[in-house]
A protein has these predicted regions:
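Phosphate-/nucleic-acid-contacting segments
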Residues: 137-223
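A short beta-strand-loop-beta hairpin characteristic of the jelly-roll/cupin
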Residues: 45-57
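Glycine- and acidic-residue-biased ligand/ion/polar-headgroup-sensing regions
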Residues: 24, 35-48, 64-65
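Cyclic-nucleotide recognition modules
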Residues: 58-111, 115
Length: 223
């Protein structure tokens, strides 16, 4: 017979601490009970919503330090590991029961939502792809080398564009000298000012310096 304390410990282990997921693993599914939120320790996570007609809307990419899974009673979307992932999980608190003890994670979750809303505010395919590449470069903490392991299909679903449109737009950027493609897995931003202009000047004032010299590993440039 399992004691009450043993059951409590099992529940605690299931909702606290660090967990690892292999590339392609599901972290949770749309419709699951939402009893914990997650912080990315390493790797990349994507969240997506599946519509009744089978269409997938990719709602966000989450990097190290990002928070996701701050939902209501039920999950409104699924979360999947884009790469091998390590996450830190914590129980979702109710108002008045510890939420005030950890405001920063919730603020970071809201910031991720604001970034997505801002990205979708761009009207044209050119605007969206340019803004996406700028965001990826700016979020890198490395002077050189930004891994972007999502596929081009992922980028298309995230930006609500077709795969063909994303591929064509990236090629157009290269032809115009805005970026340099290095094989099929890397690109370099050559003209930050021009790319910012195409994005509608949608980056912060200090962003241009961080774009110079950045290399983006883009399986996103592969299907």
């Amino acid at each position: 017979m399992i004691s009450v304390s043993s059951r409590e410990e099992e529940v605690r282990e299931a909702t606290h601490g660090v967990a690892q997921f292999a590339k392609g693993d599901s972290i949770y599914h749309q419709g699951d009970v939402a009893n914990q939120w997650f912080e990315v320790v390493s790797g990349m996570v994507r969240t997506c919503r599946f519509m009744a007609d089978g269409h997938r809307q990719l709602t966000g990419f989450y990097y190290s330090g990002d928070v996701f899974g701050v939902d209501g009673h039920r999950r409104c979307e699924s979360a999947e590991a884009v790469t091998d992932v390590v996450v830190r999980r914590s129980p979702i608190s109710i108002p008045g029961d510890g939420m005030d003890d950890a405001p920063q994670p919730f603020e970071r979750a809201l910031e991720s939502a604001r970034r997505s809303i801002f990205l979708f505010g761009h009207r044209t395919a050119t605007n969206r792809v340019a803004a996406f590449l700028i965001e990826v470069a700016q979020r890198s903490e490395l002077a050189v080398g930004v891994q972007l392991p999502m596929t081009r299909s992922d980028i298309a679903d995230h930006l609500n564009l077709t795969l063909h449109t994303v591929s064509r737009t990236i090629r157009d950027f290269a032809k115009k000298g805005l970026i340099e493609l290095n094989g099929r897995q890397h690109l370099r931003i050559l003209d930050p000012t021009g790319l910012r202009r195409l994005a509608g000047d949608a980056t912060d004032d200090g962003g241009e310096a961080r774009l110079l010299g950045h290399w983006t590993s883009a399986s996103g440039v592969t299907q």
